[in-house]
Amino acid sequence: QAKMLCCAPSLSTHNPGATLKVAKRNERMRSAGGHLHLAVGSTFHGPAGADKKPTDNPDTIRFVNLLDILVGLPSVLLDRDPNAAKRRRVYGRAGEHRLPPHGVEYRTLSNFWLRNYILMSFVFGQARQAYNIWGSSKPHAKGYDIDYLPVTVNFDFYADLLKRVDMKSVARAINRNDLDLAWKLWDKVSEFTTEFNPHQGNGVNAST
């Protein structure tokens, strides 16, 4: 088992019901991941499967898709290691995640972002924005009207974002480390994030 690359299998939002296992004993390449552990509780945990572990639910799919768009996609722009695409043939593919007791583990990133504080801040900020978009896509109270009654916002920001970017294209850009495709998609994501939160910005542009 020590010769195997990776440990427990991952779940995939791009291939629901499948588990991703890595590794042949004779595979000589090894790589380090930079996984994001998000303490968001059991909101994203569906019913336990045959292995008594939680399965994905609709909220899981939405949240991990948002992480692919806002965290995984810009990682293609920032991490230009030529081995990234090779690594993702077997490990760290788009939509890879686990559901630990504390919430969600996003397993797509390499450890490139751990090299300095600026990159760490960017990744954490993008993950936070993904969570904010997920939460804002549900009906929620936002302020009060003139009669002090709650004003409910019922606009699906997630659905609006997916009208602008195709998830299959996002997965392709991540899995192939396709810089040109990633830039085309990121331009559309940037338009959305600027509208969603004009004070935060998108964090990555051609001069970054």
Model regions and ranges:
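Phosphate/nucleotide-binding catalytic core
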Residues: 1-208
